[in-house]
């Protein structure tokens, strides 16, 4: 693995005796895009503020390019920070906002103008230099905030819920544009978000946090295919999670015997059954369930099932094959879509 541009070693922040950042170790390589994901209160925003120099550490350290950042004030750290609410200067036009960082670093007027023009072109707003920020749409404000964060050429760009205030269609479009832009510029990025789709679309690596600690770190594919534990699986939106006892190629679960892959770890575990692995069959076959709800997902219908005396299940059904609410159905399970997790929360 390439050396880290950013490194956190034992980073700890306490509020009133409670560790909101608890002995965190994390490295971000140069040109890597890392998204920190987690529910409210997991410590992800505190982590970002600690790296930016806005929140002092109670223990541990942050290094940037090998240099300890202890005692380095926020405005002297080589980082750019973009918040969810943009925080543009309302009294300045677009150019004035973008040029602020270079001007603070002593750039000449000509250099400022050239940088503004370059960045407006990059973020898709050519010719907007003299526009008032109050006249910009939400998406345009987001682009200007990004240009302002990039203007001083930071070693590290940090994004705090960068698309949180935008509508879904605009978020989905901008996350693709951001990914392309960061790849083109070779930008090193540390972003925090609570939106799983945003993180998985944007990141080279996803870090899931829980209660101030890192619950799992890996590529989007690794985290999606192999959640570390029940918390990560449920946070990613998987509902079919249960404790189980695995012996051979079967798991004894609240839903009865569930087939597992050949190489599945044995003993007391947690199993995840992906919705695609919950197969709806006639009511006289498999586990008997009642359809309690249906949710249209675009490419399929999520069918919510209530077995008798067992936790609810979610199945992914083809658009024209989904049973109606109230229908009695049977359920069988496909081993290929069953994931056996470590009982202790440690990935196998």
UniProtKB/Swiss-Prot annotation:
Cellular compartment(s): Cell membrane
Subunit structure and binding partners: The complex is composed of two ATP-binding proteins (FbpC), two transmembrane proteins (FbpB) and a solute-binding protein (FbpA).
Name of the molecule in the record: Fe(3+) ions import ATP-binding protein FbpC
Entry EC number(s): 7.2.2.7
GO molecular function, one term: ATP binding
Membrane topology: Peripheral membrane protein
Domain ABC transporter residues, every copy: 6-236
Organism, scientific name: Streptomyces coelicolor (strain ATCC BAA-471 / A3(2) / M145)
Gene3D superfamilies: P-loop containing nucleotide triphosphate hydrolases
GO BP: any one term: transmembrane transport
SUPFAM superfamilies: MOP-like, P-loop containing nucleoside triphosphate hydrolases
One GO CC term, this protein: ATP-binding cassette (ABC) transporter complex
Residue numbers binding ATP: 38-45
Protein task: Part of the ABC transporter complex FbpABC involved in Fe(3+) ions import. Responsible for energy coupling to the transport system.
Catalytic activity entry: Fe(3+)(out) + ATP + H2O = Fe(3+)(in) + ADP + phosphate + H(+)
Keywords: ATP-binding, Cell membrane, Ion transport, Iron, Iron transport, Membrane, Nucleotide-binding, Translocase, Transport
Gene label: fbpC
PANTHER family (alphabetical): SPERMIDINE/PUTRESCINE IMPORT ATP-BINDING PROTEIN POTA (PTHR42781), SPERMIDINE_PUTRESCINE IMPORT ATP-BINDING PROTEIN POTA (PTHR42781:SF4)
Family, similarity comment: Belongs to the ABC transporter superfamily. Fe(3+) ion importer (TC 3.A.1.10) family.
Disulfide bonds: none
Top-tier EC class: translocase
UniProt cross-references to InterPro entries, sorted A to Z: AAA+_ATPase, ABC_SmlMolc_Importer, ABC_transporter-like_ATP-bd, ABC_transporter-like_CS, Mo/tungstate-bd_C_term_dom, P-loop_NTPase, Transp-assoc_OB_typ2
């Amino acid at each position: 693995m390439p050396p880290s541009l950013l490194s956190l070693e034992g980073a700890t922040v306490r509020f009133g005796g409670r560790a909101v950042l608890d002995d965190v170790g994390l490295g971000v390589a140069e040109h890597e895009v890392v998204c920190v994901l987690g529910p409210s209160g997991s410590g992800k925003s505190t982590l970002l503020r600690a790296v930016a120099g806005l929140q002092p550490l109670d223990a541990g350290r942050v290094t940037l390019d090998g240099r300890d950042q202890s005692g380095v004030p926020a405005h002297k750290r080589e980082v750019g920070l973009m918040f969810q609410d943009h925080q543009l200067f309302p009294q300045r036009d677009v150019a004035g906002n973008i040029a602020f960082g270079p001007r603070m670093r002593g750039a000449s007027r000509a250099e400022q103008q050239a940088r503004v023009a370059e960045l407006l072109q990059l973020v898709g707003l050519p010719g907007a230099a003299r526009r008032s920020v109050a006249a910009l749409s939400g998406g345009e404000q987001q682009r200007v905030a990004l240009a302002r964060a990039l203007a001083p050429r930071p070693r590290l760009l940090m994004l705090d819920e960068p698309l949180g205030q935008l509508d879904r269609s605009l978020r989905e479009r901008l996350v693709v544009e951001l990914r392309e832009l960061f790849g083109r510029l070779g930008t090193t990025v540390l972003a925090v978000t609570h939106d799983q789709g945003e993180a998985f679309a944007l990141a080279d690596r996803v870090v899931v946090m829980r209660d101030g600690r890192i619950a799992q770190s890996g590529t989007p594919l690794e985290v999606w295919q192999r959640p570390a534990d029940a918390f990560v699986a449920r946070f990613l939106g998987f509902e079919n999670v249960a404790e189980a006892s695995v012996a051979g190629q079967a798991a004894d679960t609240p839903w009865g015997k569930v087939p597992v892959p050949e190489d599945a770890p044995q003993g007391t575990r947690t199993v995840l059954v992906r919705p695609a692995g919950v197969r709806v069959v006639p009511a006289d076959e498999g586990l008997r369930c009642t359809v309690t709800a249906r949710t249209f997902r675009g490419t399929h219908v999520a069918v919510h099932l209530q077995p008798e005396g067992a936790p609810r299940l979610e199945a992914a059904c083809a658009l024209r094959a989904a049973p109606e609410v109230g229908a009695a159905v049977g359920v069988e399970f496909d081993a290929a879509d069953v994931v056996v997790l470590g009982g202790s929360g440690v990935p196998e």
